[in-house]
């Protein structure tokens, strides 16, 4: 019962209202069980994936929906309206993002140096799956995070995965009257020169 997939499961055999209720109940169950610790202050995180000798590290944090609207976040795929609407309704009802949009940015030595500096701290999570995919997470120290935010302020990024989620988030932001609550989406930013994707 303590698996986040229950929060995002479509359960297409159920009516929409029942699906939403089941998703909300699954989320409440996770919170009640203490599955997540509360982060009181805003923070950036590093998420590193290591598999078969390849290592890539993402900067994880909130991305402004305005950056998508003004062209700093650049899509390269068309989206299907019904899929984006389905995700928008889910986000509106659940109120949280289920997974980050993956973004790529042009290689940057200054960014890489700050990432390496942040990785000198103790990771908050470090584990390996049965398929040998190793995952490590660090909280970025505030002084390093401030420098990263400045470097990314006007940097263009490209959507690698998550076009429908980005579209859905923009829709919900509009529906809400562009309120602060829905003005951001969770993003994972990878250096394009180190990015590895697999169709498997």
Task: Label each region the model flagged.
Residues 1-113:
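N-terminal extension/subdomain marker
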Residues 72-79, 136-139, 155-157:
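Flexible, glycine/proline-enriched loop segments at strand-loop-helix junctions
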Residues 86-103, 108-151:
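Phosphate/anion-contacting hairpin/loop surfaces
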Residues 138-184:
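Active-site beta-strand/loop microenvironment that shapes enzyme catalytic pockets
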Residues 179-195:
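ADP-ribosyltransferase catalytic core
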Residues 196-200:
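Conserved small/polar residues in nucleotide/adenosyl-binding loops
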């Amino acid at each position: 019962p303590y698996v986040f997939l229950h929060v995002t499961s479509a359960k297409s055999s159920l009516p929409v209202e029942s699906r939403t209720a089941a998703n909300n109940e699954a989320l409440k169950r996770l919170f009640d069980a203490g599955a997540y610790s509360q982060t009181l202050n805003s923070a950036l995180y590093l998420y590193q994936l290591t598999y078969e000798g390849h290592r890539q590290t993402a900067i994880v944090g909130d991305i402004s929906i305005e950056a998508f609207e003004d062209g700093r976040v650049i899509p390269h795929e068309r989206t299907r309206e019904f899929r984006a609407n389905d995700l928008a309704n889910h986000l509106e009802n659940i109120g949280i993002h289920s997974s980050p949009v993956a973004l790529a940015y042009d290689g940057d030595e200054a960014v890489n140096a700050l990432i390496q500096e942040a990785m000198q701290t103790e990771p908050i999570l470090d584990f390996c799956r049965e398929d040998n995919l190793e995952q490590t997470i660090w909280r970025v120290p505030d002084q390093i995070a401030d420098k990263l935010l400045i470097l990314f302020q006007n940097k263009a990024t490209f959507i690698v995965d998550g076009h429908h989620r980005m579209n859905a988030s923009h829709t919900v932001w509009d529906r809400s009257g562009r309120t602060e609550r829905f003005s951001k989406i969770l993003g994972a930013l990878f250096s394009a020169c180190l990015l590895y994707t697999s169709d498997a």
